[in-house]
């Protein structure tokens, strides 16, 4: 997965992890029922004998698995992800289910580059529309997983599904969509309708809600601008999933309100001419294209 900014292709580099909680790995493993007090004593003795880390000694004694150690480390560093997780959460949410997957590492690279090149709270730049030229290029996948990796920084993150044509976030996160963005824009709900995601601290999802008969008109209302302004006050970052640019004007409207957009393309599928037209459409909507991402997943 590569992201191209207005200047160059983003290099691959790492991202910081949140600060540790101070809890010891042994205590976390015991709290989770992975080790007994007797097991912990055995591990400590082995640790002293070999000079290894606690987790390494526990694995060597076959008392825990690699996956259980990674889960404990994630809790120690306040790095939330799903192990068993809520029933029905899609496996597409790879950043939550498999946070050490190479694709997720690339998403963290993109997160880091966006933080360095785009994110600017003082200038009001904390809302990003995720769009593409055509359907099936991975907008919803990228939006959902970017939201997860931002929340893993320990900051409040909001994912809004503004794709009234084919909403998917309610299925990806398995959240109810009786109320959502359409409800808020029509005056039947508030931003507080956004649902916290169980197991992913700091992440909330505002699903599309009931599909309206007038998507573009609803997104053009001043209430959408007001909702985004309020969201920027309450959340560290706001990610918005949109319909494809090539089929509907909705994405231009959302990008205009967000002010910034990330364009998703798919390897071996998206044509250069379609990408160029999508960039023009976003520019015509007075949106800044912060980068173009090639989805290879």
Predicted regions and their residues:
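P-loop NTP-binding module
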Residues: 1-50, 60-83, 87-297
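Short, charged amphipathic recognition helices of the HTH superfamily
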Residues: 53-54
């Amino acid at each position: 997965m590569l992201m191209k900014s207005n200047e160059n292709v983003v290099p691959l580099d790492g991202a910081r992890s949140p600060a540790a909680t101070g809890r010891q790995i042994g205590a976390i493993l015991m709290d989770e029922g992975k080790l007994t007090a007797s097991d912990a004593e055995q591990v400590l003795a082995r640790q002293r004998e070999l000079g290894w880390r606690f987790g390494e000694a526990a694995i060597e004694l076959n008392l825990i698995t690699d996956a259980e150690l990674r889960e404990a480390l994630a809790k120690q560093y306040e790095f939330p992800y799903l192990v068993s997780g809520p029933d029905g959460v899609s496996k597409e949410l790879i950043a939550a289910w498999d946070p050490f997957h190479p694709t997720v590492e690339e998403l963290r690279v993109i997160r880091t580059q966006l933080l360095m090149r785009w994110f600017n709270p003082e200038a009001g730049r904390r809302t990003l529309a995720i769009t593409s030229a055509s359907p099936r290029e991975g907008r919803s996948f990228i939006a959902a997983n970017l939201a997860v990796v931002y929340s893993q920084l320990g900051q409040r993150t909001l994912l809004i599904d503004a794709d009234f044509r084919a909403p998917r976030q309610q299925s990806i996160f398995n959240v109810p969509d009786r109320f959502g963005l359409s409800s808020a824009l029509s005056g039947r709900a508030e931003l507080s309708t956004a649902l916290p995601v169980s197991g992913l601290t700091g992440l909330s999802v505002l699903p599309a809600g009931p599909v309206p008969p007038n998507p573009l008109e609803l997104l053009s209302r001043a209430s959408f601008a007001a909702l985004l302004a309020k969201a920027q006050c309450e959340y560290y970052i706001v990610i918005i999933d949109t319909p494809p640019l090539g089929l509907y004007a909705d994405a231009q409207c959302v990008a205009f309100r967000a002010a910034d957009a990330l364009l998703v393309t798919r390897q071996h599928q998206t044509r250069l001419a379609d990408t160029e037209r999508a960039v023009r459409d976003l520019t015509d909507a007075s949106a800044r294209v912060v980068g173009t991402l090639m989805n290879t997943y």
